[in-house]
Amino acid sequence: MSLIPRPDGVRSFRGYLASAFLLSALPSACLAAAHPSSPTPTSAPTNTTSALVGQRALYDLSLAESGGNTLSATGNMTYVVRDTCSAWSTQQHLDIQSATRNGGAVNMVSDYTTLESKDGRHLVFRTVQKSNDAVLQVVSGEANVDAQGHGVVQYEKPIKKTLKLPDGTLFPMAHTAAILAAAQRGAPNIAPLLFDGTGPDGAQETYITLLGWGPPKDPVTSPALANQPAGRVHVAFFSRTPDSILPDYEIGMRYFANGVSDMLDMDFGDFRMRGTLHSLTLPPRAAHC
């Protein structure tokens, strides 16, 4: 996939958005045909995000490898998570400049906001994606999951419609909490469904591989992470269609116990981008909660 604006450019750009969601929280079983093993199932949470923290993180993005149309790519991503006592408020700004073999210079920008209840049952979302200042797509609406794990999403944009969410679908912060919980108990993999509001097609399949959990082996990039256990995480994203055998995109990262990541490796097929933590601020927990 490529950064050049094309009919599937919105879908391609969704991979960058998913990368950012996994930082905060970064989106059921994966397709059995694609993954013969049986990953640990997950279910809708009651309140699983208590270990996560508010944060303001700035990442530098650079091209790590290219075998396709992308000649160069750089950018930055700002991610802000606020603890509002009963919910998590997130804001993300992503700005990527690239050069392609046949498309010249391209500037891809996204602005994304969510409000996710801490019980994992309600999500309000809005995503605006642009290429060279032209709006590619706006996705907005809200989603709800009941106590039994049955969910529904009501889109306002790009068109008004209602979709059912598969049982067990997790929202972004709950998805991250599930990853961290699995890492801490030593699970080798999990495969929860994710709905993050970055696209108009409902939930995605995710397959998550977890490697090692404990004191970081590599130096940490921020003093705020010095005493946090961490582990390596690899996430593959799949469309929920019968022919989706290969992932749409993949992300590797080092996750800390508080939900912060300081190293990213984003694989989009014909090129890879590396993300490094430039600065991190962890605000104190609200005393009135």
What are these regions (language model features)?
Residues 16-29:
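Bacterial N-terminal signal peptides
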Residues 128-289:
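Mature, soluble, non-transmembrane domains
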Residues 30-105:
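N-terminal cleavable signal peptides for secretion/export
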Residues 1-13:
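N-terminal secretory signal peptides that target proteins for export/translocation
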Residues 61, 90-92, 123-127, 262-266:
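Short hydrophobic/aromatic-rich beta-strand segments that constitute the beta-sheet cores
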Residues 92-145:
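Hydrophobic/aromatic-rich structural module bridging two neighboring secondary-structure elements via a short loop
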Residues 48-53, 80-89, 115-121, 225-226, ...:
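A short, structured loop/turn motif at beta-sheet edges
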